[in-house]
Swiss-Prot record:
GO terms for biological process: base-excision repair. GO terms for molecular function: 8-oxo-7,8-dihydroguanine DNA N-glycosylase activity; class I DNA-(apurinic or apyrimidinic site) endonuclease activity; damaged DNA binding; zinc ion binding. Its cofactor is Zn(2+). Involved in base excision repair of DNA damaged by oxidation or by mutagenic agents. Acts as a DNA glycosylase that recognizes and removes damaged bases. Has a preference for oxidized purines, such as 7,8-dihydro-8-oxoguanine (8-oxoG). Has AP (apurinic/apyrimidinic) lyase activity and introduces nicks in the DNA strand. Cleaves the DNA backbone by beta-delta elimination to generate a single-strand break at the site of the removed base with both 3'- and 5'-phosphates. This is Formamidopyrimidine-DNA glycosylase. It comes from Rickettsia massiliae (strain Mtu5). The active site is at residues 2-3, 58, 262.
Amino acid sequence: MPELPEVETLKNSLKDKLIGLIVENVELKRDNLRYKLSPLLATEILNTNILDVRRRAKYLIIDFNNDYSLIVHLGMSGRFTLQSANYKTQKHDHVIFDLSNGEKLIFNDTRRFGMIYSFKTDLLEQEFFNDLGIEPFSDLLTLEYLKDKLQTRKRPIKNLIMDNRVIVGVGNIYASESLHLARIHPDKSGSDLRDDEIENLIKSIRDVLTKAITAGGTTLKDFVNGDNKPGYFTQQLTVYGKEGQSCLSCSSTIIKTKHSGRSTFYCKTCQYRLASFTI
Protein backbone atom coordinates (compact mmCIF):
# COMPACT_ATOMS: atom_id res chain seq x y z
CA MET A 1 0.00 0.00 0.00
CA PRO A 2 1.41 3.44 -0.90
CA GLU A 3 2.58 5.31 2.20
CA LEU A 4 3.49 8.94 2.85
CA PRO A 5 6.58 9.08 0.57
CA GLU A 6 4.65 7.62 -2.36
CA VAL A 7 1.77 10.08 -2.00
CA GLU A 8 4.21 12.97 -1.51
CA THR A 9 6.01 11.84 -4.67
CA LEU A 10 2.69 11.67 -6.52
CA LYS A 11 1.82 15.17 -5.34
CA ASN A 12 5.19 16.54 -6.44
CA SER A 13 4.86 14.96 -9.88
CA LEU A 14 1.38 16.40 -10.50
CA LYS A 15 1.26 19.76 -8.74
CA ASP A 16 2.96 22.09 -11.24
CA LYS A 17 1.28 20.35 -14.17
CA LEU A 18 -2.27 20.57 -12.81
CA ILE A 19 -2.51 23.98 -11.16
CA GLY A 20 -4.50 26.36 -13.37
CA LEU A 21 -6.13 23.66 -15.48
CA ILE A 22 -9.90 23.17 -15.70
CA VAL A 23 -11.71 19.85 -15.33
CA GLU A 24 -13.92 19.75 -18.42
CA ASN A 25 -15.39 16.29 -17.98
CA VAL A 26 -15.48 13.50 -15.41
CA GLU A 27 -16.19 9.94 -16.56
CA LEU A 28 -17.04 7.30 -13.98
CA LYS A 29 -16.40 3.87 -15.50
CA ARG A 30 -17.99 2.12 -12.50
CA ASP A 31 -20.06 3.23 -9.53
CA ASN A 32 -17.83 1.86 -6.79
CA LEU A 33 -14.24 1.30 -5.72
CA ARG A 34 -13.64 0.36 -2.09
CA TYR A 35 -16.80 2.32 -1.39
CA LYS A 36 -19.57 3.59 -3.60
CA LEU A 37 -18.61 6.56 -5.77
CA SER A 38 -20.89 9.55 -5.35
CA PRO A 39 -22.70 10.48 -8.58
CA LEU A 40 -22.11 14.11 -7.54
CA LEU A 41 -18.39 13.58 -8.13
CA ALA A 42 -18.93 14.21 -11.83
CA THR A 43 -20.66 17.55 -11.23
CA GLU A 44 -19.13 19.11 -8.10
CA ILE A 45 -15.76 19.74 -9.74
CA LEU A 46 -16.91 20.13 -13.35
CA ASN A 47 -15.65 23.27 -15.13
CA THR A 48 -13.62 24.34 -12.11
CA ASN A 49 -10.01 25.55 -11.90
CA ILE A 50 -7.42 23.55 -10.01
CA LEU A 51 -5.92 25.78 -7.31
CA ASP A 52 -3.59 23.42 -5.50
CA VAL A 53 -2.40 19.82 -5.16
CA ARG A 54 -1.37 18.77 -1.66
CA ARG A 55 -1.12 15.83 0.70
CA ARG A 56 -2.55 14.97 4.12
CA ALA A 57 -1.36 11.67 5.60
CA LYS A 58 -1.74 9.12 2.76
CA TYR A 59 -4.39 11.18 0.95
CA LEU A 60 -3.81 13.25 -2.18
CA ILE A 61 -5.93 16.41 -2.20
CA ILE A 62 -6.78 18.55 -5.23
CA ASP A 63 -8.35 21.91 -4.37
CA PHE A 64 -10.69 23.69 -6.78
CA ASN A 65 -11.85 27.30 -7.05
CA ASN A 66 -15.45 26.44 -6.11
CA ASP A 67 -14.45 25.55 -2.53
CA TYR A 68 -14.54 21.81 -3.20
CA SER A 69 -11.63 19.40 -2.99
CA LEU A 70 -11.01 15.99 -4.52
CA ILE A 71 -9.63 13.47 -2.01
CA VAL A 72 -7.82 10.44 -3.42
CA HIS A 73 -6.56 7.37 -1.55
CA LEU A 74 -4.61 4.89 -3.67
CA GLY A 75 -5.55 1.84 -1.60
CA MET A 76 -3.44 -1.23 -2.39
CA SER A 77 -2.87 -0.87 -6.12
CA GLY A 78 -4.19 2.53 -7.19
CA ARG A 79 -2.44 4.66 -9.79
CA PHE A 80 -3.24 8.31 -10.53
CA THR A 81 -1.45 9.34 -13.70
CA LEU A 82 -1.45 12.12 -16.24
CA GLN A 83 -1.89 10.86 -19.80
CA SER A 84 -1.88 12.41 -23.27
CA ALA A 85 -5.00 13.27 -25.27
CA ASN A 86 -4.63 10.15 -27.45
CA TYR A 87 -4.41 7.80 -24.45
CA LYS A 88 -6.32 4.55 -24.94
CA THR A 89 -8.39 3.54 -21.92
CA GLN A 90 -7.08 0.50 -20.02
CA LYS A 91 -9.06 -2.28 -18.33
CA HIS A 92 -8.84 -0.96 -14.77
CA ASP A 93 -9.23 2.76 -15.51
CA HIS A 94 -12.19 3.60 -13.27
CA VAL A 95 -12.31 7.41 -13.21
CA ILE A 96 -11.15 9.70 -16.02
CA PHE A 97 -10.78 13.48 -15.70
CA ASP A 98 -10.55 15.39 -19.00
CA LEU A 99 -8.44 18.53 -18.57
CA SER A 100 -8.48 21.83 -20.42
CA ASN A 101 -5.02 21.25 -21.95
CA GLY A 102 -6.25 18.08 -23.65
CA GLU A 103 -4.60 15.69 -21.21
CA LYS A 104 -6.38 13.15 -19.04
CA LEU A 105 -5.96 12.40 -15.35
CA ILE A 106 -6.61 8.68 -14.89
CA PHE A 107 -7.41 6.74 -11.71
CA ASN A 108 -6.54 3.10 -12.33
CA ASP A 109 -6.99 0.49 -9.59
CA THR A 110 -6.69 -3.23 -10.25
CA ARG A 111 -7.80 -4.37 -6.79
CA ARG A 112 -10.32 -1.53 -6.26
CA PHE A 113 -9.29 -0.73 -2.67
CA GLY A 114 -8.79 2.93 -3.56
CA MET A 115 -11.15 5.76 -2.74
CA ILE A 116 -12.15 9.04 -4.40
CA TYR A 117 -14.34 11.66 -2.73
CA SER A 118 -15.32 15.27 -3.27
CA PHE A 119 -15.70 17.36 -0.13
CA LYS A 120 -16.03 20.98 0.96
CA THR A 121 -12.49 22.28 1.35
CA ASP A 122 -13.05 24.22 4.56
CA LEU A 123 -14.56 21.17 6.28
CA LEU A 124 -11.80 18.68 5.50
CA GLU A 125 -9.84 18.94 8.74
CA GLN A 126 -12.90 19.12 11.00
CA GLU A 127 -14.95 16.36 9.38
CA PHE A 128 -12.91 14.24 6.96
CA PHE A 129 -9.51 14.21 8.68
CA ASN A 130 -10.70 14.75 12.24
CA ASP A 131 -9.26 11.44 13.53
CA LEU A 132 -5.79 11.91 12.06
CA GLY A 133 -2.68 12.58 14.12
CA ILE A 134 0.10 14.97 13.20
CA GLU A 135 2.42 14.91 10.21
CA PRO A 136 5.92 13.44 10.68
CA PHE A 137 7.55 16.67 9.47
CA SER A 138 5.37 18.94 11.59
CA ASP A 139 6.99 21.05 14.31
CA LEU A 140 4.26 19.64 16.56
CA LEU A 141 5.94 16.23 16.52
CA THR A 142 8.10 16.75 19.59
CA LEU A 143 9.46 14.66 22.42
CA GLU A 144 6.68 15.96 24.65
CA TYR A 145 3.94 15.10 22.15
CA LEU A 146 5.11 11.57 21.40
CA LYS A 147 6.01 10.82 25.01
CA ASP A 148 2.47 11.79 26.03
CA LYS A 149 1.00 9.50 23.35
CA LEU A 150 3.23 6.55 24.29
CA GLN A 151 3.45 6.66 28.08
CA THR A 152 0.08 5.02 28.74
CA ARG A 153 0.23 2.56 25.86
CA LYS A 154 1.54 -0.97 26.32
CA ARG A 155 1.34 -1.85 22.63
CA PRO A 156 4.49 -2.59 20.59
CA ILE A 157 6.15 0.59 19.37
CA LYS A 158 5.86 -0.55 15.73
CA ASN A 159 2.08 -0.68 16.01
CA LEU A 160 2.02 2.73 17.68
CA ILE A 161 4.03 4.61 15.05
CA MET A 162 1.78 3.06 12.39
CA ASP A 163 -1.32 4.33 14.20
CA ASN A 164 -2.63 7.29 12.19
CA ARG A 165 -4.13 8.74 15.36
CA VAL A 166 -0.58 9.19 16.67
CA ILE A 167 1.55 9.91 13.56
CA VAL A 168 0.19 9.82 10.03
CA GLY A 169 1.73 8.22 6.98
CA VAL A 170 4.22 5.81 8.57
CA GLY A 171 3.18 2.52 7.01
CA ASN A 172 4.63 -0.94 7.31
CA ILE A 173 7.75 -0.48 5.20
CA TYR A 174 8.86 2.76 6.81
CA ALA A 175 8.02 1.62 10.34
CA SER A 176 10.45 -1.30 10.02
CA GLU A 177 13.09 0.91 8.42
CA SER A 178 12.74 3.70 11.00
CA LEU A 179 12.95 1.34 13.97
CA HIS A 180 16.06 -0.28 12.54
CA LEU A 181 17.72 3.10 12.05
CA ALA A 182 16.76 4.06 15.62
CA ARG A 183 17.96 0.65 16.94
CA ILE A 184 14.65 0.03 18.70
CA HIS A 185 13.12 -3.45 18.81
CA PRO A 186 9.66 -3.42 17.14
CA ASP A 187 8.17 -5.39 20.06
CA LYS A 188 9.25 -2.90 22.71
CA SER A 189 6.31 -1.34 24.53
CA GLY A 190 5.75 2.30 23.67
CA SER A 191 5.48 3.14 27.35
CA ASP A 192 8.98 1.71 27.99
CA LEU A 193 10.83 4.05 25.63
CA ARG A 194 13.29 6.45 27.23
CA ASP A 195 13.34 10.13 26.26
CA ASP A 196 16.51 9.70 24.20
CA GLU A 197 14.96 6.75 22.35
CA ILE A 198 11.85 8.78 21.53
CA GLU A 199 13.95 11.68 20.23
CA ASN A 200 16.05 9.30 18.15
CA LEU A 201 12.92 7.62 16.79
CA ILE A 202 11.44 10.95 15.66
CA LYS A 203 14.70 11.79 13.88
CA SER A 204 14.88 8.33 12.31
CA ILE A 205 11.31 8.50 11.01
CA ARG A 206 12.03 11.86 9.40
CA ASP A 207 15.36 10.70 7.95
CA VAL A 208 13.87 7.55 6.42
CA LEU A 209 10.86 9.37 4.97
CA THR A 210 13.07 12.13 3.54
CA LYS A 211 15.32 9.61 1.79
CA ALA A 212 12.30 7.74 0.46
CA ILE A 213 10.76 10.92 -0.96
CA THR A 214 14.07 11.85 -2.58
CA ALA A 215 14.16 8.40 -4.21
CA GLY A 216 10.60 8.77 -5.49
CA GLY A 217 9.06 6.33 -3.01
CA THR A 218 9.15 2.55 -2.90
CA THR A 219 7.77 0.47 -5.74
CA LEU A 220 7.36 -3.16 -4.71
CA LYS A 221 4.71 -3.91 -7.32
CA ASP A 222 2.13 -1.29 -8.29
CA PHE A 223 3.19 2.23 -7.34
CA VAL A 224 4.07 4.80 -10.00
CA ASN A 225 4.04 8.58 -9.78
CA GLY A 226 1.92 10.91 -11.90
CA ASP A 227 4.35 10.52 -14.80
CA ASN A 228 3.99 6.73 -14.65
CA LYS A 229 7.50 6.29 -13.20
CA PRO A 230 8.34 3.89 -10.32
CA GLY A 231 10.06 4.77 -7.06
CA TYR A 232 13.61 3.63 -6.33
CA PHE A 233 13.82 3.55 -2.52
CA THR A 234 13.57 -0.25 -2.80
CA GLN A 235 17.30 -0.20 -3.51
CA GLN A 236 17.97 1.54 -0.15
CA LEU A 237 15.86 -0.68 2.12
CA THR A 238 17.95 -2.01 5.01
CA VAL A 239 15.63 -4.56 6.65
CA TYR A 240 12.23 -4.63 4.96
CA GLY A 241 11.92 -7.73 2.80
CA LYS A 242 15.45 -8.85 3.81
CA GLU A 243 14.57 -11.91 5.91
CA GLY A 244 17.57 -14.22 6.29
CA GLN A 245 19.99 -11.69 4.82
CA SER A 246 22.85 -10.02 6.68
CA CYS A 247 22.29 -6.70 8.41
CA LEU A 248 24.28 -3.98 6.65
CA SER A 249 25.28 -2.51 10.02
CA CYS A 250 26.46 -5.58 11.94
CA SER A 251 26.18 -8.64 9.63
CA SER A 252 23.68 -10.40 11.93
CA THR A 253 20.66 -12.10 10.37
CA ILE A 254 17.51 -10.11 9.60
CA ILE A 255 14.45 -11.62 11.30
CA LYS A 256 10.85 -11.60 10.06
CA THR A 257 7.92 -11.62 12.48
CA LYS A 258 4.27 -10.53 12.44
CA HIS A 259 2.56 -7.57 14.09
CA SER A 260 -1.21 -7.43 13.74
CA GLY A 261 -0.97 -9.59 10.63
CA ARG A 262 1.72 -7.43 8.99
CA SER A 263 5.26 -8.54 8.25
CA THR A 264 7.93 -6.96 10.43
CA PHE A 265 11.66 -7.06 9.75
CA TYR A 266 14.43 -6.27 12.23
CA CYS A 267 18.03 -7.05 13.17
CA LYS A 268 18.34 -9.28 16.22
CA THR A 269 21.61 -7.56 17.21
CA CYS A 270 21.13 -3.88 16.35
CA GLN A 271 17.62 -3.99 17.80
CA TYR A 272 18.35 -6.36 20.67
CA ARG A 273 15.72 -6.52 23.41
CA LEU A 274 15.96 -8.30 26.75
CA ALA A 275 12.27 -8.80 27.53
CA SER A 276 9.75 -10.47 25.28
CA PHE A 277 6.41 -8.97 24.34
CA THR A 278 3.25 -10.94 23.68
CA ILE A 279 1.25 -9.56 20.78
